[in-house]
């Protein structure tokens, strides 16, 4: 699978070489390399191919008793031999994606201090805020191109996990490599340890993070600024991905820094891009336009509102005015439909609130604001998207009412992990007589209904962010814009089996994700060039750059370099 046979010249030898995950080959070191690098006697006699190694570790993986055990085992391989880890993933991505990322990574974050084995990435704690430059210089990799950073305050649907949130950057960067071909040598996971308000963690004698309540307000903002400044000094061209920051910080941080460096928030922008790509694919398959849809959101946090704004932007591209587009988006939170008469709406929610006069008479009961069923009924909804983190909010009554207004509604329960999903695909299909188009945030098995097998699309950000990262790295874009994200959404939609005629799933199978990432990368890079955010080149040069930056897991020959 390697694209080059050029040898790699390295200065490490003996046990030190075996302890470097990026360079270790384990039993695959050749006889010549074992002599040249002082490895004789440190490894079993037999020299194995990487395929033979994959067979062994997969056999060991299958012996693990639980999904968490499998996660721990895969991480141990990653910490020992990164090339073997990614070759194993490449061979079994469908099976292992739910183990290295959602839903299993959620439990791994909760148990982080209990299952901790060895260091990976950087832990930057608030008490060490005056040493951030030194900490970044301590990174074992120099040529960092992508950083995923979290402060762990909103890990999936699990809330504040303290330093346990490190599992998310590690998992996300594993997907950058497995799905988007970004070399693991160019990636760095970081957790910002600003304390935790999770009392269970503070009281846990095994908790490894800073035992202090979360820093907030100006102290928090100043700490983030110190971190951003230090990153820009160390790696001025890096792509910085914000991950699992709380709603109150996620949008303000994105708005503050998106024009200062190449950054994006995957929870807001990545989720929005894959959701819009899924919605565009469904519309194309039904020969409808996005502007014909009425979209109801259950959950009005930063992720839901980010998706809504991305849909509005796509509707405007189709020709709707902004006011027309906003009238087709309905945000429902725990109090009901967001309307202008609501108090305490956040700024990004106010833009999506319906005019009170437009929804007068929608309230069926004694509630102050229209509830979900009221909204679905009166809006004539055709699409319903769940980003609430609350199990069971898509009730049978609500889904059946949705089906009344649309023969083939698109239903997207996106909350993670599976225990938080608004409704299961089996429930949705049963309540719509098998007619709904379903895309979920977590993986679900195919559903048998009406004598046919329905494959469930996983509307997972892994379809989007690896391709965005690959495109940014390939063209050396200086920023990530909304138009680049829209280009990614359109590229994803064009890959849908429903659009290409290759199947009935809304999104392509995971076995095709590397090709999908390449197409998204090209679309993103083209748009970056069109906006003047990357040097203009020919399309052929872009394709060559994408392939040049697409790392494949295979061993290179080593040669000894004198120190």
Curated annotation (Swiss-Prot):
Amino-acid positions noted as binding a divalent metal cation in the UniProt annotation, renumbered to this chain: 243-244, 267
Site entry: Important for activity: 267
Binding site for NAD(+): 154, 267, 416
Pfam name, any one: Malic_M
Ranges that cross the membrane: none
Entry annotation: catalytic residues: 101 (proton donor), 172 (proton acceptor)
Cofactor binding mode and count: Divalent metal cations. Prefers magnesium or manganese.
Name of the protein this chain belongs to: NAD-dependent malic enzyme
